[in-house]
Amino acid sequence: MIVAVGTKNPNKIRAVEDAYRLFGIPARIVPAPRPLTTPPQPVGLEAVLKGAVERAKAALQAVEKAEHGVGIEAGVVEAGGVHLDITIAAIVDAGGRTTIGFGPAFQIPPPFLSQVLSGVEMGAVAEQYFKRPSIGYREGLIGVLTKRRVTRYHLNLAAVAMALTPRLPHNSQLYLKP
């Protein structure tokens, strides 16, 4: 199966490869450019979800013979007065079916919040604060905060695995629309 992924980020690509492998689904992963309509730092659950779905649809259309398009989007949501960084994955197939998965979310450090809420990408804020380049393409902010015990890869892997769950053969009857 050819799986198109709406990113060039190696963390996301590896997470998609490993999620499909985790469930024994043979897949050739092909990176595709992210759509230009996706903001660099989506704020709000609907905006993050929309970004993931747009990435998945654009990837599916961009890669010839792809059976799945996968989009992974991280963004900011508010819950209980706390701002969290959340990762959402969407998988779209050629038949138009979309499945969604969420990864773990973590609390955004207060010094980052105003810039992130104004649309500055979390990775850029973290790179400036910690004076380290390419954090988003490496361990991610969560990797810095946890000293690499949990990395951006782990958040991406969890989100994609959750989006794959309804597609697993033993779950097919559970997820049929009534």
Curated annotation (Swiss-Prot):
It catalyses: XTP + H2O = XDP + phosphate + H(+); ITP + H2O = IDP + phosphate + H(+). Keywords: Hydrolase, Magnesium, Manganese, Metal-binding, Nucleotide metabolism, Nucleotide-binding. It holds the Pfam family NTPase_I-T. Transmembrane segments: none annotated. Binds 1 divalent metal cation per subunit; can use either Mg(2+) or Mn(2+). One of its GO terms (biological process) is nucleotide metabolic process. GO terms for molecular function: ITPase activity; metal ion binding; nucleotide binding; ribonucleoside triphosphate phosphatase activity. InterPro entries: ITPase-like_fam, Non_canon_purine_NTPase, NTPase/PRRC1, YjjX_NTPase. Its cofactor is Mg(2+); Mn(2+). Its EC number is 3.6.1.73. Phosphatase that hydrolyzes non-canonical purine nucleotides such as XTP and ITP to their respective diphosphate derivatives. Probably excludes non-canonical purines from DNA/RNA precursor pool, thus preventing their incorporation into DNA/RNA and avoiding chromosomal lesions. Homodimer. This is Probable inosine/xanthosine triphosphatase. It comes from Pyrobaculum aerophilum (strain ATCC 51768 / DSM 7523 / JCM 9630 / CIP 104966 / NBRC 100827 / IM2).
